[in-house]
Amino acid sequence: MTEAAELPPAPEQAREVFGDRFADAVRYAELLAEAGVQRGLIGPREVPRLWERHLLNCAVLSEVVPEGVTVCDVGSGAGLPGIPLALVREDLKITLLEPLLRRTNFLTEVVELLGLDHVTVIRGRAEEVMGKIPPVHVVTARAVAPLDRLATWGIPLLRPYGEMLALKGDTAEEELKSAATALSKLGAVETSVLHVGEGVVDPLSTVVRVEVGESPGGVRFAAKRAKAARTGRTRRRR
């Protein structure tokens, strides 16, 4: 049996980033280190670096999220980046989208315990909920899938002229080049690689931004979205 790793104290940067929600950030870190490890949501080797590699790495995504928008965190897992983002940005309306029950149970417990009234947890896959939940301004994701595959799930959930923000690693530029054709077919009009978290995390967090035009997901997904919307209206009339 592997001995449980100990959660280190929060770094000073965490107090600055999370502000009034610092105590909640500490509680979330404790939940990840305890229940998260016990339920297999996060590896025990990640516990010593929870703050730098996970909570702060995700929280600094807020630097590139517009004010007062709706956000869907696709494949939210244990709540990364959705929960840290929610802790630092109460102006956002955030949906945590996750297909696995054990993960959505954990997310629901965290949301209720921390009093995150601006966060909703939905169990499901992105391709299943398209047309069933309102399109959002921003889709976020971290460690879900290669960019081309992630885009086929995330971009169709966007409103016209929305954007997908994917936390990536050193291969961000390569992934973006490899996914160029797929992104274009999905309605992307602008892409970029951003580095955020100056003075908070080292190395900086890398974000791939994909901005879409009038038809997120392209023609094929526009038709699918319209069909899902019509089906929803029919069911409501019944």
Curated annotation (Swiss-Prot):
EC number: 2.1.1.-
Protein origin, superkingdom: Bacteria
Subcellular location as annotated: Cytoplasm
Cytoplasm among keywords: yes
Gene3D superfamilies: Vaccinia Virus protein VP39
Signal peptide bounds: none
Gene Ontology cellular component terms for the protein in this record: cytosol
Residues that bind S-adenosyl-L-methionine: 75, 80, 126-127, 142
Function: Specifically methylates the N7 position of guanine in position 518 of 16S rRNA.
The protein's name: Ribosomal RNA small subunit methyltransferase G
Species whose genome carries this gene: Streptomyces avermitilis (strain ATCC 31267 / DSM 46492 / JCM 5070 / NBRC 14893 / NCIMB 12804 / NRRL 8165 / MA-4680)
Underlying gene: rsmG
